């Protein structure tokens, strides 16, 4: 007879997203001016959606100055294109709408999938190996807040 060990099946517990914690620090909606918003999008960024999402989760519902400080100190490669996008959105807000940078607030920061760039790498014996590079679109909406 062969002996085998009985292993009890332990289901994996999924880690909950910290959405409530993020929403708890959001500015009250009565202080947000509804129609005073700046929309900025960057398309086809050479980065995975999941890597960009990790950085965007940290800057959502924060003031502009705090966001710039966080993005400068983050060690991720994804923070640099997002920092350029936030700079550009704030420059648009000050140039076109005469908004003050101290009153700017990030209300929406989202990332969506883009196309996949496909390349082929030559391998041994005349074979080829596909390389898939993921790309994403990043959208940021800045609102002005009454202080």
Swiss-Prot record:
Keyword Transcription appears in the UniProt entry: no
A GO molecular-function descriptor: rRNA binding
Subcellular location: Plastid, Chloroplast
Source taxon at top rank: Eukaryota
GO cellular component, one term: large ribosomal subunit
UniProt KW keywords: Chloroplast, Plastid, Ribonucleoprotein, Ribosomal protein, RNA-binding, rRNA-binding
Gene Ontology terms: biological process: translation
InterPro entries listed in its UniProt record: Ribosomal_uL22 (IPR001063), Ribosomal_uL22_bac/chlpt-type (IPR005727), Ribosomal_uL22_bac/org-type (IPR047867), Ribosomal_uL22_CS (IPR018260), Ribosomal_uL22_sf (IPR036394)
Matches recorded under CDD domains: Ribosomal_L22
Main subcellular location: plastid
Quaternary data: Part of the 50S ribosomal subunit.
Protein family according to the UniProt entry: Belongs to the universal ribosomal protein uL22 family.
Protein role: This protein binds specifically to 23S rRNA. The globular domain of the protein is located near the polypeptide exit tunnel on the outside of the subunit, while an extended beta-hairpin is found that lines the wall of the exit tunnel in the center of the 70S ribosome.
Name this polypeptide is given: Large ribosomal subunit protein uL22c
């Amino acid at each position: 007879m062969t002996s085998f060990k009985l292993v009890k099946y332990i289901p994996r517990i999924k880690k909950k997203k910290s959405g409530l914690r993020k929403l708890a620090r959001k500015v009250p909606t009565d202080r947000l001016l509804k129609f005073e918003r700046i929309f900025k999008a960057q398309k086809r960024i050479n980065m995975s959606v999941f890597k960009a999402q990790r950085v965007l989760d940290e800057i959502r519902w924060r003031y502009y100055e705090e966001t710039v400080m966080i993005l400068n100190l983050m060690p991720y490669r994804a923070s640099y294109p997002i920092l350029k996008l936030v700079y550009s959105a704030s420059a648009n807000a000050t140039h076109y709408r005469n908004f003050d940078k101290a009153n700017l607030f990030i209300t929406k920061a989202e990332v969506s999938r883009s196309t996949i760039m496909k390349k082929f790498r030559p391998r041994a014996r005349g074979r080829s190996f596909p390389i898939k590079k993921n790309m994403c679109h990043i959208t940021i909406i800045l609102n002005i807040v009454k202080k």
